[in-house]
Amino acid sequence: MADFDAVLKCWGPVEADFNTVGGMVLARLFKDHPDTQKLFPKFAGIAAGDLAGNAAVAAHGGTVLKKLGELLKAKGNHAAIIKPLANSHATKHKIPINNFKLITEALVHVMQEKAGLDAAGQTALRNVMGIVIADLEANYKELGFTG
């Protein structure tokens, strides 16, 4: 619970502009791990240098961070949020679980830069995302998706 609260303390700048911060997170993910861009068919043709300012990337990043905000505010009581998220990411989008770990690191980096997330906050964010990812993975297994 303390980890969720620690992350929520720095969540204000993210909530203030989900799309801008979300675009930064996805651009960072694609820069650090270029293969992840292939998992997003609508972004496949966007040149690396154009990702950061792309409106579609920003909009999708905003969607990702809004959902993460819901998960944070649920403070671990998130089964009703996780189940449909896992279902769509396993059955429709086919996103391997490791990619959630990769986006976690992109998010940590961006939140450090843009929201002043200190070392303790970074640890808290990694802990929270570890819980979320473990629950996603459990749902993936129930669905028979090993991606």
Curated annotation (Swiss-Prot):
InterPro entries: Globin, Globin-like_sf, Myoglobin. Residues 2-141 form the Globin domain. Heme b binds at residue 89. GO terms for cellular component: extracellular exosome; sarcoplasm. It catalyses: Fe(III)-heme b-[protein] + nitric oxide + H2O = Fe(II)-heme b-[protein] + nitrite + 2 H(+); H2O2 + AH2 = A + 2 H2O. Its EC number is 1.7.-.-, 1.11.1.-. It is found in: Cytoplasm, Sarcoplasm. The keyword Metal-binding applies. One of its GO terms (molecular function) is oxygen carrier activity. GO terms for biological process: removal of superoxide radicals. O2 binds at residue 60. Monomeric heme protein which primary function is to store oxygen and facilitate its diffusion within muscle tissues. Reversibly binds oxygen through a pentacoordinated heme iron and enables its timely and efficient release as needed during periods of heightened demand. Depending on the oxidative conditions of tissues and cells, and in addition to its ability to bind oxygen, it also has a nitrite reductase activity whereby it regulates the production of bioactive nitric oxide. Belongs to the globin family. Monomeric. This is Myoglobin. It comes from Auxis rochei (Bullet tuna). The lineage of its organism: Eukaryota, Metazoa, Chordata, Craniata, Vertebrata.
